[in-house]
């Protein structure tokens, strides 16, 4: 029997290949960083061929280091940085421009024009997204506008567009499959999340030819097999794909309506499963497709926090208050409170529910008695306050009161932060044994498609709790602290 599932986790700064066994345990992992390009301030690009090379390298490393033969791999699941956009020549496989990364703001001008024409409500209704440079649609338009002859070639069917999942499936399959999954398609600003089709009206507004778009398929399905020369002489099913945050929701086994997870990475991404209904947000959230599986599509509400773990990196690298990120916990616990200090880490603006790109970071409540410990604690607490902002919006939009929050990402190792998060939300916070839930969602989706696992019940049974944090704070204190945070955010937004 094929003993392993291979996850390809293609992220913003590195590519990883991870082998999982049938218990959902990590057998071995390989990682390789690649180059970030910043051609102009605010622009972020990747070389799509370098990404492909990094993926091939980590696949080779993980198999050789784990001493696993390619024929022992039952299937491949892909999870990826979302929204990042590649346009390439169908016949040669050569990209016509660098991949424009989700973080890149180079299409902000296009977005401003679209909003000035009053298109925002139309895009929001059809795609569940805001018109923003974050999403793929304006990135495709930018490439077609700026690379000579590109739009004409696209109209003739000579060019293909894909998010990173599509690019990797196309390359692994030797160009046999030009596909994406529902979760990635729902992040493009071109896909109607209600009809589940590329939307002709939106494509016309963006001036993107339909001929270049991939076929949209379920998140758990055999799309193609690897061509032998890319997989050591073996044809292995490429059987699952999902954007990184949706993959984390799946990896956390948040399969029922109202379940939610928060990933504490560079930023924070909170997703709540809303079942088979797309809940339109009135509170600054995105409506997105969680996954398509078992013949149906399920939806999620998503909140994005731009600065989370990067605030702790700032304490370490920018202010040099700590030597390692882990030190922040010990410093925070040396004081009883922040002594009235609030840090609003709006280094690149504020995301959900404010969506204000102009606001900048601020610190409030400083006195002569403020110490380094207070400052570090206030910075950590800002992650929890921002998460509460997002959860309040989710509960208002969905009408669902959260009973438990499942967490993952680098910062969840910080016990102080997790306890404060539970106290502030007044719900238990659950940290799983396997923190690699983004990478875990992809092999689960692929494994279901090839019969490696039989059902979602099998997967839910594998989810293991490492620690549960119970709320201990009284309501009056919780209200007082959160009121102070809201006041600090208002003050920061007023200072422009």
Swiss-Prot record:
Q: Which reaction is recorded as catalysed by this protein? A: glycerol + ATP = sn-glycerol 3-phosphate + ADP + H(+)
Point out residues bearing the modification Phosphohistidine: 230
Q: Which gene encodes it?
A: glpK
Description of pH dependence: Optimum pH is 7.5.
The UniProt PTM text for this protein says: The phosphoenolpyruvate-dependent sugar phosphotransferase system (PTS), including enzyme I, and histidine-containing protein (HPr) are required for the phosphorylation, which leads to the activation of the enzyme.
What organism does the record attribute this protein to? Thermus aquaticus
Q: Might you give the EC number(s) for this enzyme?
A: 2.7.1.30
Q: What is this protein called?
A: Glycerol kinase
Q: Top-level EC class, please? A: transferase
Q: Binding positions for ATP? A: 12-14, 266, 309, 313, 410
Keyword Nucleotide-binding belongs to the record: yes
Determine the domain of life of the protein's source: Bacteria
Q: Which pathway?
A: Polyol metabolism; glycerol degradation via glycerol kinase pathway; sn-glycerol 3-phosphate from glycerol: step 1/1
Report residues binding ADP. 12, 16, 266, 309, 410, 414
Binding residues for glycerol = 82-83, 134, 244-245
Q: Tell me, what does this protein do in biology?
A: Key enzyme in the regulation of glycerol uptake and metabolism. Catalyzes the phosphorylation of glycerol to yield sn-glycerol 3-phosphate.
The similarity comment for this entry is:
Belongs to the FGGY kinase family.
